[in-house]
Amino acid sequence: MNNIIKMLNDEQMKTDVPDFGAGDTVVVQVRVKEGEKERLQAFEGLVIAKRNRGLHSAFTVRKISNGEGVERAFQTHSPLIASIEVKRRGRVRRAKLYYLRERSGKSARIREKLATK
């Protein structure tokens, strides 16, 4: 029984998910259905949390829109997500960046992770 569940989960998992973590800036292309039409909507922001649970993996992206903080949680392997693109790698020392909710301006900046040779 356990093997059947594992096989079904592996079958539904996406293989084109890039490697990213907390502190990275990502652009998530989300499929949005409006009436009969379906279009892609981009959501760009900072990953403040990532949850690795196989098929049930999720991540939370935060952005500032018109001076207001907006957070959106995505299921990593959801069919509504068309693509995830990593724009910038951030250097952080925490797995969850919830403390950024109280910060704004320069204090909410994240250092960039430089590529190692």
Swiss-Prot record:
State a single Gene Ontology molecular function: structural constituent of ribosome
Q: Which GO terms describe its biological process?
A: translation
TM region positions: none
Pfam families assigned: Ribosomal_L19
Single GO cellular component term: cytosolic large ribosomal subunit
Instruction: Kindly give the InterPro entries that the UniProt entry links to this protein.
Output: Ribosomal_bL19 (IPR001857), Ribosomal_bL19_CS (IPR018257), Ribosomal_bL19_sf (IPR038657), Translation_prot_SH3-like_sf (IPR008991)
| Keyword list, A-Z | Ribonucleoprotein, Ribosomal protein
Give the protein's biological function.
This protein is located at the 30S-50S ribosomal subunit interface and may play a role in the structure and function of the aminoacyl-tRNA binding site.
Q: Which family does it belong to?
A: Belongs to the bacterial ribosomal protein bL19 family.
According to UniProt, the name of this protein is Large ribosomal subunit protein bL19
Which species does this protein come from? Shewanella frigidimarina (strain NCIMB 400)
